[in-house]
Amino acid sequence: MTGWYEFPVMIGFVSAAVFLLISVAYLPLLNDLYWSTLKSLTPPAGIVADLLVTNGTIFTSDSSLPFADSMAIRNGRILKVGSFATLKGFIGDGTMEVNLEGKIVVPGLIDSHVHLISGGLQMAQVGLRGVSQKDEFCKMVKDAVQNAKEGSWILGGGWNNDFWGGELPSASWIDEISPRNPVWLIRMDGHMALANSLALKIAGVISLTEDPVGGTIMRMPSGEPTGLLIDAAMELVTPWVKEISVDERREALFRASKYALTRGVTTVIDLGRYFPGTTDELSWKDFQDVYLYADSSKKMMIRTCLFFPITTWSRLLDLKLQKGSVLSEWLYLGGVKAFIDGSLGSNSALFYEEYIDTPNNYGLEVMDPEKLSNFTMAADKSGLQVAIHAIGDKANDMILDMYESVAAANGDRDRRFRIEHAQHLAPGSANRFGQLHIVASVQPDHLLDDADSVAKKLGSERAVKESYLFQSLLNGNALLALGSDWPVADINPLHSIRTAVKRIPPKWDHAWIPSERISFTDALIAQTISAARAAFLDHHLGSLSPGKLADFVILSTNSWDEFSKDVSASVLATYVGGKQLYP
């Protein structure tokens, strides 16, 4: 099933006629040599295309015409898709053609959950993603300290203690190598961070410091902080961290956007630099200083839909009333975002039963449920879309219950409530997404990080019954939207699609919970038109349909059969608005 967005299930998608069009020739890297100007042809009366894409297998994500071999584009939008015979009338003086030579085209890929500027910033910081040994962790910090000015903050992130056996890092690991530089290293999930002793001293975090509501200071038996702060406790340190300049943030956006284009990403849903333990002003500063600047100076490279902290819902409402939701073809105002719990890796996701590896720990409510309900009620009543982070089974049920109550109180409308992650669901909860018309915004690649550790935290039975229930969500008619949560996981939609289809973790030779694998078509739909619909962007993009923005990706394969079976293709070229922006 494909969900309540009314895209029918397609079986045997490509007819023999389409396959006859697929060439076995290899398409070299696309560049200006592959464009030809068709000046010798007499322009037809009427509309002339700027660009004609021909001789390929074009998957449209549009149920009215799932496949075509050609596509005509004008002024950044799609004129028509179909056979070359039906499109050649758009050829005129100045029409440019790209011959796909049998290659596959898909709509521009949409990442439904990113933190774009955070990702761009992290690319220039101490990158600890994939580090699998304590010595390697410490060496990377030491190298950063040696290249930094005395007293400057050493910032980084991406570490995952499960990669080196589960032992949590502590300030003692890095104190000797960073005596004069405060260090702040965020775990890959964004819900835990390591501070060295100097950073703790600057922030005034001592043994007598109380745990804040919605957060935990990890402590030694003596009561002294270990250096690890979870969720809201991170706010004890973040105000002391050096403020990142406007220029650094602008450069982070450009760096992140260029990287996204290499992965075929043309649109992102940006949840902002908003995490437990951060101020709700960061998202607004980035909007004012970075996004509006990039948009007005025509420096945007990918389309971005912005979500803002739910505590600022009235501010977003005022802005939407003044400007509308579409600020430009590049910049869109989405809705509001909140958190109810933490993360599995930080043992702060909220569950009905305790964590096996930390007895008497059920996780955290990182926001008071009554306050969250009040904010949600007000934001929804004003017409704003609401997206709430929920990972644990209890957290998801709390949000499902709250959404149901809010919808009943505020009346019927097309609200498209979102739950971000929907990672662990109690029996029966997956069906409620479809019943309540709630978007399940999920990140398949997270399961690759969790597969080895979730049984240790929850037990094998709970892990198998509750974790990443993608097919169950589809069976319940939920709208499934795929994303990465970058920089928590890499921004790589083709890899996410492969994970959703295969569910084979690293070093495994079999699928984890194979019954929850989804079909290739469902995964691709969830990364295109469903992702657009999940953010109210489906009238603008998400499918290669006449009138929509001409965002598309050319892949490295000539075979739809192989692509749909192995999902092993790579990105050859990325087009945004009919213009090639990568390579």
Curated annotation (Swiss-Prot):
**Where is this gene product found?**
Membrane; Cytoplasm, Perinuclear region
Q: Which PANTHER family match?
A: IMIDAZOLONEPROPIONASE (PTHR22642), PROTEIN LONG AFTER FAR-RED 3 (PTHR22642:SF2)
| Name of the molecule in the record | Protein LONG AFTER FAR-RED 3
Whichever gene encodes this chain, its name is: LAF3
Q: What happens when the gene is disrupted?
A: Reduced inhibition of hypocotyl elongation in continuous far-red light (FRc), associated with a strongly attenuated disappearance of XTH15/XTR7 transcripts.
Lineage of the native species?
Answer: Eukaryota, Viridiplantae, Streptophyta, Embryophyta, Tracheophyta
One example of a Gene Ontology biological process annotation: de-etiolation
Residue positions the entry lists as glycosylated:
N55, N374
Provenance organism: Arabidopsis thaliana
Please report the record's description of how this protein sits within the membrane: Single-pass membrane protein
Predominant subcellular localization, coarse grouping: membrane
